[in-house]
Amino acid sequence: MTHSPLAQFDIKKLIDIKMFGFDVSFTNSSIYMLLASILALTYFYLAFYKRKLVPSRLQVSAEIVYNLVADMLNQNIGVKGRKFIPLVFSLFIFILFCNLLGMTPYSFTATSHIIVTFTLAILVFLIVTIVGFVKHGLRFLTLFLPHGTPLWLAPLMIVIELFTYLARPVSLSLRLAANMMAGHVLLKVIAGFTVSLMIYLKFLPIPIMVILIGFEIFVAILQAYIFTILSCMYLNDAINLH
């Protein structure tokens, strides 16, 4: 067992693959992202395979998650946002399952790596930009000039708004990766202290550890929610030019 709190984030090659000079090896990160996808698909398949008038607990939980995402889109975008339910729902579920899977002992948290979260963030960024130009054409560029801006202030505001827009995928990805990494490092460090304290305090430190794990699960769910709701807000900017 390793004692370094950062060792849990090490990328390990499982299958070495090279394509056109690029390293596309199958790693522990790959397998946990694949596992998260399989678990999510299995969960919703079992929940909706035999839908009942009186739903099972599994079906109820799946419907709650679906309605949560649908409400996010409805509140942020309105009726026009319904067509994006598959995208936003898939995004939320993938991040949620990756986060929760990383809470199991000796597992790997794919969303603690900036390359994973940045890929998701840049996907959202590109879709938002494409949707904006497809729907509004060049009028989408008015997003970078707030309504009512004085003419003399327009050049500065355009630069600021453009920089803010381009920084979206960076802030979106860093927020998720940093929170997941910080939480897991904290748990690892405190778990090490807990084992040592049990020698002197018996089982007293265990409730503290349980509370911290519960809090980290809450953070895992919250971070998936925050990433998704910010994506909805960005989509709203592209669709309604707010």
From Swiss-Prot:
Keyword Transmembrane helix recorded: yes
The entry's keywords: ATP synthesis, Cell inner membrane, Cell membrane, CF(0), Hydrogen ion transport, Ion transport, Membrane, Transmembrane, Transmembrane helix, Transport
InterPro entries: ATP_synth_F0_asu, ATP_synth_F0_asu_AS, ATP_synth_F0_asu_bact/mt, F0_ATP_A_sf
Topology in the lipid bilayer: Multi-pass membrane protein
Keyword Membrane: yes
Main location: membrane
Disulfide linkage: none
Transmembrane segments: 29-49, 84-104, 114-134, 140-160, 181-201, 203-223
UniProt GO cellular component terms: plasma membrane; proton-transporting ATP synthase complex
A molecular function GO annotation: proton-transporting ATP synthase activity, rotational mechanism
Localisation per UniProt entry: Cell inner membrane
Pfam families: ATP-synt_A (PF00119)
Subunit structure: F-type ATPases have 2 components, CF(1) - the catalytic core - and CF(0) - the membrane proton channel. CF(1) has five subunits: alpha(3), beta(3), gamma(1), delta(1), epsilon(1). CF(0) has three main subunits: a(1), b(2) and c(9-12). The alpha and beta chains form an alternating ring which encloses part of the gamma chain. CF(1) is attached to CF(0) by a central stalk formed by the gamma and epsilon chains, while a peripheral stalk is formed by the delta and b chains.
Family label: Belongs to the ATPase A chain family.
NCBIfam families with a match to the protein in the record: ATP_synt_6_or_A (TIGR01131), PRK05815.2-4 (NF004482)
Function: Key component of the proton channel; it plays a direct role in the translocation of protons across the membrane.
Protein name: ATP synthase subunit a
